[in-house]
């Protein structure tokens, strides 16, 4: 099913689109967290630290691919909002062909570079082999990552955010079951978790293809899936590359921070891994609320409906703030039982609790910055989102480097560097937003 977001009441339309996105990411985060919980409980702290230190590199590759899909999805949304079905078809087929070639090459490079990249991150020698094996399995399955993210982004661009959620729910349950089977029953350790993740994502791809062929006429292309429109490739690459670089910049900053944490020892790494999984429950849904804003705004921008574009932007910001407040309260009140889900060691639990409580104090800031970025993406100005993300990560890493190695601060003070990064984003984004509003561009 598709949904025309250029008509109807703005608030219910945006909420209806946003909720499946948020739920989908919560399910995805749940099975990511399940990897950590199962590894931590059934394999041990070393394996948990290895999975945690591998996660930034794994996420970098996934987010880069997701960024390509997100950028192409904006073009699909704009064409769909304008009622240009032929352009939608050609945009989808061109992205599918170019993305397949890219993801295969990218996957091979990632597998080959897994060891040197982990060494660059200063991963301790005792957990390096575990981390390498985990990463290589995940990287080998990046073709499935591309196809799922591409198909899901395309459905969302056409206003269908619910279908991808249903597939992801099924995949999440199977992934958790696979984790338990491969790790607890077969004793395959962290490699079993990685294999379970890849297989569950492959299933998502199959389900998406079946659904599209049955329910979405505009994507039932048949042989037209093989149509490659070189005239659309330049815009696709420009949007996709800028969006991918924005996503990659954010993750590169996280990798640099992970490298700093790695100097604090295995206990700090395990605590950081557990707390960061909870952090993901704050940041990822906030990003997806912004993605919902992008879709609604892009469709209406393509249809030339400026007032609906503005209404969608401010409605999305309100949703961001409410979510940030709720999660802040939960993490402040229940930090200890949450961290205890991941590890049993009292020292690691104490480190994780202190980190999480400090991090939760800043949860409103990424809500605002993500909302503003969603607005600029919806208007097609991806350079603003890239620049602001670079500022965020640059200042975050600089602040972390000063706090931890130079001032010898404890792990719990690391989230202060996050706040400094988000503040730099706001200082850059707010004047541009005010200018857009004054010039009636938004």
Regions found by a protein language model. Give the residues of each.
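Residue-level signal for short hydrophobic patches within transmembrane helices
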Residues: 7, 11-30, 34, 57-64, ...
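Transmembrane helical elements of multi-pass membrane transporters/channels
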Residues: 16-35, 137, 171, 200-204, ...
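Short alpha-helical transmembrane segments in multi-pass integral membrane proteins
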Residues: 1-18, 76-141, 185-241, 297-362, ...
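Short runs within selected transmembrane alpha-helices of multi-pass transporters and secretion channels
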Residues: 69, 137-156, 164-172, 193-208, ...
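Generic alpha-helical transmembrane segments of integral inner-membrane proteins
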Residues: 22, 26, 30, 34, ...
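Interfacial/gating helices of multi-pass transporter permease domains
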Residues: 39-59, 126-130, 190-193, 232-239, ...
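Small-residue-rich hydrophobic transmembrane alpha-helices
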Residues: 48-108, 145-164, 271-335, 366-380, ...
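Helix-terminus/linker motif at the lipid-water interface of multi-pass membrane proteins
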Residues: 26, 30-49, 118-125, 181-188, ...
């Amino acid at each position: 099913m598709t949904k025309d977001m250029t008509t109807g009441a703005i608030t219910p339309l945006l909420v209806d689109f946003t909720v499946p996105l948020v739920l989908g990411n919560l399910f995805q985060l749940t099975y990511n967290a399940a990897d950590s919980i199962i590894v931590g409980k059934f394999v041990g702290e070393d394996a948990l630290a290895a999975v945690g230190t591998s996660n930034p590199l794994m996420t970098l590759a996934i987010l880069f691919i997701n960024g390509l899909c997100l950028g192409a999805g904006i073009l699909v949304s704009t064409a769909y909002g304008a009622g240009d079905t032929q352009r939608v078809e050609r945009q989808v087929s061109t992205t599918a062909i170019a993305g397949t070639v890219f993801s295969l090459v990218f996957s091979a490079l990632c597998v080959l570079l897994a060891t040197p990249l982990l060494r660059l991150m200063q991963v301790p020698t005792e957990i390096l082999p575990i981390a390498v094996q985990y990463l290589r399995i995940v990287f080998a399955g990046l073709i499935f990552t591309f196809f799922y993210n591409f198909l899901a982004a395309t459905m969302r661009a056409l206003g269908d955010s619910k279908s991808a959620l249903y597939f992801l729910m099924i995949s999440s349950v199977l992934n958790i079951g696979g984790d338990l089977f491969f790790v607890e029953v077969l004793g395959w350790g962290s490699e079993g978790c990685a294999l379970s993740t890849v297989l569950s994502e492959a299933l998502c791809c199959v389900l998406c293809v079946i659904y599209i062929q049955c329910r979405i006429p505009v994507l039932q292309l048949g042989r037209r899936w093989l149509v490659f429109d070189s005239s659309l490739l330049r815009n696709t690459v420009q949007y996709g590359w800028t969006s991918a670089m924005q996503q990659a910049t954010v993750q590169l900053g996280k990798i640099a921070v992970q490298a700093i944490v790695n100097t604090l020892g295995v206990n700090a790494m395990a605590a950081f891994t557990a707390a960061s999984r909870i952090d993901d429950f704050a940041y990822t849904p906030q990003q997806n609320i912004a993605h919902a804003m992008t879709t609604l705004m892009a469709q209406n921008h393509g249809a030339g409906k400026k007032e609906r574009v503005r209404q969608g932007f401010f409605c999305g910001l309100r949703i961001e703030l409410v979510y940030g407040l709720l999660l802040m309260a939960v993490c402040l009140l229940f930090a200890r039982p949450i961290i205890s889900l991941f590890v049993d060691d009292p020292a690691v639990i104490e480190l994780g609790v202190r980190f999480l409580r400090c991090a939760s104090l800043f949860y409103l800031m990424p809500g605002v910055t993500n909302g503003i970025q969603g607005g600029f993406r919806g208007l097609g100005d991806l350079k603003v989102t890239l620049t602001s993300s670079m500022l965020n990560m640059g200042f975050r890493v600089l602040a972390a480097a000063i706090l931890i190695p130079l001032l010898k601060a404890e792990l719990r003070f690391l989230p202060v560097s996050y706040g400094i990064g988000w503040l730099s984003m706001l200082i850059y984004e707010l004047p541009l937003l005010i200018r857009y509003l004054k010039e009636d561009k938004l």
